[in-house]
Amino acid sequence: MPILYFGSYILIVCLVIVCDQLTKLWILHNFQLYEVREVIPDFFNLVYVVNTGAAFSMLADVDSPWRHYFFLFIGLGAVLGLTVYTYTLRKEHFLHMVGLACIVGGALGNLIDRVSYGYVVDFLDVYVGGYHWPAFNVADSAICVGVVLYMTMTLLAGNKEKKQK
C-alpha cells in the first residue's frame, strides 16, 4: 500500500478524532449535565448527557466493573482489526478506505472518552414530536457515515464485478 494512501487514512482518522473531541470539550465547558438548548424547534437540540453503555446505551444498566474493560477491549480490537484490514486494501478502493477511516476515527473518539471520563459524552438530540432518537455525538455520526459508505462501495464493487463477468 502506498504511503500517501495510508497517510490519507491516518489524516481522516485524526480529523474525525479532532472534530469529535473539540465538540465534546465545547459541550463540557458550556453545558451543565442534562442541560438542553433548542436549536431547531421540534427537531434538534443540543444536550449534555453521558453514556456508560455502548451504542444506544446498551449494557449501561449492567453493574459490573468489567463492563468498562469489555468496551475498551472491543473498541481497541475493532480499531486494530480495521486498520490492519485497511492496510491490505488496494488503492482503487479509496472510498472503502475513507469509510473505514471514519469508523476507526469515531471508535477512537469514543474510546478517548471512556479512558478519560469512564463514559461517552453525547450531545446531539434529534427528535420529531415526542419521539427522541438516542443522543449521539460526532464520533457516532462518523461511524454511521463510515458504515454506510463502506457498505455502499462494497455493493457497487460487487455489481461492477458481476457486470464484467
Curated annotation (Swiss-Prot):
Main location: membrane
EC annotation from Swiss-Prot or TrEMBL: 3.4.23.36
Membrane-spanning ranges: 2-22, 39-59, 69-89, 92-112, 138-158
GO cellular component labels: plasma membrane
Active site residues of this protein: 122, 140
GO molecular function annotation: aspartic-type endopeptidase activity
Cellular compartments annotated: Cell inner membrane
Membrane topology type: Multi-pass membrane protein
Domain of life, per lineage: Bacteria
GO BP, sorted A to Z: proteolysis
The protein's enzyme class: hydrolase
Any Pfam family hit: Peptidase_A8
InterPro entries in the cross-refs: Peptidase_A8
Reactions the enzyme catalyzes: Release of signal peptides from bacterial membrane prolipoproteins. Hydrolyzes -Xaa-Yaa-Zaa-|-(S,diacylglyceryl)Cys-, in which Xaa is hydrophobic (preferably Leu), and Yaa (Ala or Ser) and Zaa (Gly or Ala) have small, neutral side chains
Pathway linked to the protein: Protein modification; lipoprotein biosynthesis (signal peptide cleavage)
Keywords of the record: Aspartyl protease, Cell inner membrane, Cell membrane, Hydrolase, Membrane, Protease, Transmembrane, Transmembrane helix
Protein role: This protein specifically catalyzes the removal of signal peptides from prolipoproteins.
UniProt record similarity statement: Belongs to the peptidase A8 family.
HAMAP family: LspA (MF_00161)
Protein's UniProt name: Lipoprotein signal peptidase
Underlying gene: lspA
